[in-house]
Swiss-Prot record:
Identification of the protein by name: 4-coumarate--CoA ligase-like 4
Disulfides per UniProt: none
Domain-related comment: Both substrate-binding domains (SBD1 and SBD2) are involved in the substrate recognition, and are sufficient to confer the substrate specificity.
Organism: Oryza sativa subsp. japonica
Residue numbers spanned by region SBD2: 347-411
Record bears the keyword Nucleotide-binding: yes
Length: 552
């Protein structure tokens, strides 16, 4: 009798030669067998010893778990009734900075089977109007300050994420209530609930569009439930008597913030301290005032902490969790030297994978410099040669494909993009060039679509960026493909110089040329005051490409 593929999985790397796939070295997390479970019911049913769910960092207001779930039930009852009449399949938009109201609005809408979409408050009215036209929400949660950014569609109802109404609110017919009003509603026990299953859409989040137009990503209740279980396992939060306190510095409109702070952590009894926006002094005050133990952040915040002349006071902080973009060796070492008492952990994920894919879950795992970590629980991966389509073994670079219960359902109203990204048997083509080493650690080399094609060679921008960041007079950098008739494309660098530096284009090009193969040389340089990045810290190369080519 032949050996099954299951028996042929290499325990060290997770690679199965028979199927040419990698399997996570982490134990699978249990998922509910009942198909008729929505993420809100799942979260509310978790048992834990936590008391305080949310804290407003600015005011100190505390919301207990009892108050949170009462508010969610009340808000859901109010939203299901006239005049909003929110139903399963309707889309609800949240346009808001971080606040303790954000999770209440999100959970109330999803509990009804509505699909949640979010927008960046920094977006222009035109950008928001484009998303509204695509998603067609029937309800928007927003603040008084952001209300003018919403298109004046007559059929769009608005719930203000404010504590009380003001006299001027009555002049806008779109406003039906405040979040405090609907949260105080007595839940109607006779209300008929729509049947919501794990396969139903839960969120419609628009991808960052770092390389092209933004697309709506549809995730299901199963996706979010998987994420909740993986988060609780990663931080060993379930069944613990100790309450951890997380500081929310990342935007809840982004997949990272939404799945962690507005959903995942609320299922395990952790306390979430909410910053309305990131400012270093306010972050430090909150860390010390509220006894924060975990600090999830994006790389630019980490850079600021390392760049500070003296170590910052971090109180009871034990772990920093970085996501959104990979961390370089120099940054990790600089942080460890300045804050030896704090572990630094990393994560890798996409909007399309509900922010899940790989992570380092201990200081020891993070010491493998450059890694995104081990594959997440319940995850399979392939490394696929972009040219031949062949699945590759250990230590070979190709496009990362992943499969797991958290993978998106597809792109909203975009069958072509869905078919090119999701295979019929559930593999998500990430668009990232990666390899998995002999111990099962994932390394992200670059974005497949961002490779610079110089003659017949492929040049990863991230490699040149990492090199340029080692220059003592460079504080930030982005490398893009610059079109050229003879060679196709060549590397162009946008550089942010250190204050007082007179670094020249020639010096930059010589610095790189001494350390790389000829085809990787930087052949054009521009100096800028900052590098455009999205909310998760990823470089917006498309903006820089547009800037560079607009002068041609």
């Amino acid at each position: 009798m032949g050996r099954s593929p299951e028996m042929e999985v290499d325990a060290r790397s997770g690679y199965c030669a028979a199927t040419r796939t990698f399997r996570s070295r982490r134990a699978d997390v249990p998922l509910p067998a009942d198909p008729e479970v929505d993420v809100v019911s799942f979260l509310a049913s978790r048992r834990h010893s936590g008391v305080v769910a949310l804290v407003d960092a600015a005011t100190g207001r505390r919301i207990t778990f009892t108050e949170l779930w009462r508010a969610v039930a009340g808000a859901a009852s109010a939203l299901a009734a006239h005049p909003v009449s929110l139903r399963k399949g309707h889309v609800a938009l949240i346009l808001s900075p971080n606040s303790v109201h954000f999770p209440v609005a999100a959970l109330a809408a999803m509990s009804l089977g509505a699909v949640l979409t979010t927008a960046n408050p920094l977006n222009t009215p035109a950008e928001i109007a484009k998303q509204v036209a695509d998603a067609r929400p029937v309800l928007a949660f927003t603040t008084r300050e952001l209300l003018p950014k919403l298109p004046r569609a007559h059929d769009l109802r608005v719930v203000l994420l404010e504590s009380a109404r003001l006299p001027g609110d009555s002049s806008d017919p779109r406003i039906v209530a405040t979040i405090e009003e609907i949260s105080a509603t007595t839940p109607d026990p006779a209300r008929r609930k729509d049947r919501v299953t794990q396969d139903d859409p839960a969120t419609l989040l628009y991808s960052s569009g770092t390389t092209g137009p933004s697309k709506g990503v549809v995730a299901t209740h199963r996706s979010l439930i998987s994420m909740v279980q993986i988060i609780m396992t990663r931080f060993r939060l379930e069944g613990s008597d100790k309450t951890e306190t997380f500081l929310c510095t990342v935007p809840m409109f982004h997949v990272y913030g939404l799945v962690a702070f507005a959903t995942g952590l609320l299922g395990c009894g952790a306390t979430v301290v909410v910053l309305s926006k990131y400012e270093l002094p306010e972050m430090l005050r909150s860390i010390n005032a509220y006894g924060v133990t975990y600090l999830p952040l994006v790389p630019p915040i980490l850079v600021a902490m390392v760049a500070h002349p003296k170590p910052l006071p971090l109180g009871q902080m034990r772990k920093v969790l970085s996501g959104g973009a990979p961390l370089g060796k120099e940054l990790i070492e600089g942080f460890r030297e300045k804050y030896p008492q704090v572990e630094i952990l990393q994560g890798y994920g996409l909007t399309e994978s509900t922010a899940i894919g790989a992570s380092t879950d201990s200081a020891e795992e993070s010491r493998r410099y450059g890694t995104a970590g081990l594959l997440s629980p319940n995850t399979e991966a392939k490394i696929v040669d972009p040219d031949s389509g062949e699945a590759l073994p250990v230590n070979r670079t190709g496009e990362l494909w992943i499969r797991g219960p958290y993978v998106m359902k597809g792109y909203f109203k975009n069958a072509e993009a869905t078919q090119s990204t999701l295979t019929p048997d559930g593999w998500l083509k990430t668009g990232d060039l990666c390899y998995i080493d002999e111990d099962g650690y994932l390394f992200v080399v670059d974005r497949l679509k961002e490779l610079i094609k110089y003659k017949g060679y492929q040049v990863p921008p991230a490699e040149l960026e990492a090199l340029l960041l080692t220059h003592p007079e460079v504080t930030d950098v982005a490398v893009i493909p610059f079109p050229d008739r003879e060679v196709g494309q060549f590397p162009m660098a946008y550089i942010v110089r250190k204050k007082g530096s007179n670094l020249s284009e020639r010096e930059v090009m010589e610095f790189v040329a001494k350390q790389v193969a000829p085809y990787k040389k930087v052949r054009k340089v521009a100096f800028v005051t900052d590098i455009p990045k999205n909310a998760s810290g990823k470089i917006l190369r498309k903006d820089l490409i547009k800037l560079a080519t607009s002068k041609l």
